[in-house]
Amino acid sequence: MKKILLVASIFATMAFNSLFAQYDELRILFADQKYEKVVKLADKMIGDDKFKKDPMVYYWLSKGLYKVSQSGNTAPEYKNAYKESINHLGKLLRNDKEGEAIQEDEINEYLLEVQGSLVEQIKNEISTGNFRKASSWILTYKKVTKNPIGQMLLEAAGKFKADDKSGGIAGLKVAETELAKVKDIKDFTEADKEMFKLGLIWGAEGYTSIRQVEKAKALLEKGSEWFRQDEDFQEAYNKMAR
């Protein structure tokens, strides 16, 4: 019996060491800036049953793709590397049931970086009047946040811009139901806060476009306790007050 237990223990230790050896290989490849190899190894690992729900492997796959998207690699298989990196980051969050992975500093920092890059994409498209393209990124943001209220408001605002007034009204109704549950934003990331602020401003703009000014004012009022010191929010708020 002791021999059986000893053999079982040896195999368990070998499997454990093998697991971390593969993590180490991903880390080493990443440190060497061999991002395509990181992607290929992580993708191969996910095909194995023991890794397919492993948040750490999705982290390396996402981060590898994110770096490839910034590297200028024009290979066809990496054409959508940025979007794919976000998809896999979303899978990391979904598989991180206990929230342990996201507590790791390096993973949390990466999440914040990706969120910030998405917000910049959204703001750039909105600033050039391309709300249709911004809407695609707004939908994508939902995959990488635990605080989607800003995303919900902006998604509804996008429907007004697409002349889908009934969809916009319905979207704002759902979003405002969720907004009523928001008691504070201390757990929001900086990107979450920016999305929330933008959602309030453009959601109010949506109401104004159908001449429901009082609803626009009421929506902005709901966010005033958190954003009254913000210049952009205050400008929109004062505009509605006139």
Where are these regions (language model features)?
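TPR/TPR-like (Sel1-like) alpha-helical repeat modules
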Residues: 76-99, 166-181, 208-231
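Extended amphipathic alpha-helical interaction segments
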Residues: 101-201, 208
